[in-house]
Amino acid sequence: ASAGPIAFVNDSKATNGVAAARALEAFDNIYWIAGGLAKEDGIGAAAQALDHVAGAYLIGESTPIFARALEGRCPATAHGNLHAATTAAFADAWAGGIAATVLLAPAAASFDQFNSFADRGDAFTGIAQKLAASVSGTGRGGAHA
C-alpha cells in the first residue's frame, strides 16, 4: 500500500537482526516498526544499519531490549501493539511531507502477539490499507493498495 509519497513495506519475515538489516539498507527515510519476541541475538545487525532510519517504533516483549540497543543511535518510541506503532510511524512520515517508507522488519519472532509472521504481516497490510485510505482525499497523492 502507499499513500502519496509514503510507501508501506511488509517484511514481517525479517525475524532476526541480519534480515532486518538487509531491509533497512534497501530503503531511504525509513520509519521502522520493530519488535516482538526477541531472538538470541536481540536486535543484532540491525543496530548497525540505521543510516536511513528516521525513527524506530517498537512493539512486543522485546521493546525494552531493543530500546536499549537503539539508545543514542536513532529515535525510538514504545507502542502497545502493531496498530499503534504503524499509525504513529505513518503520522510521522506523513508530517514529513517527503518520500518515506513505513517498514515492518521486526528483527524478532511474532509469537508474543501473533500466530505467525504471516499473521503479523497480514495485520500490517490491513492497517496500512486503512491508513492510506484515510488520506486519499487530502490532495497529497492518492492511495494505492
Please place each PLM-identified region on the residue numbering.
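ATP-dependent carboxylate-amine ligase
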Residues: 2-145
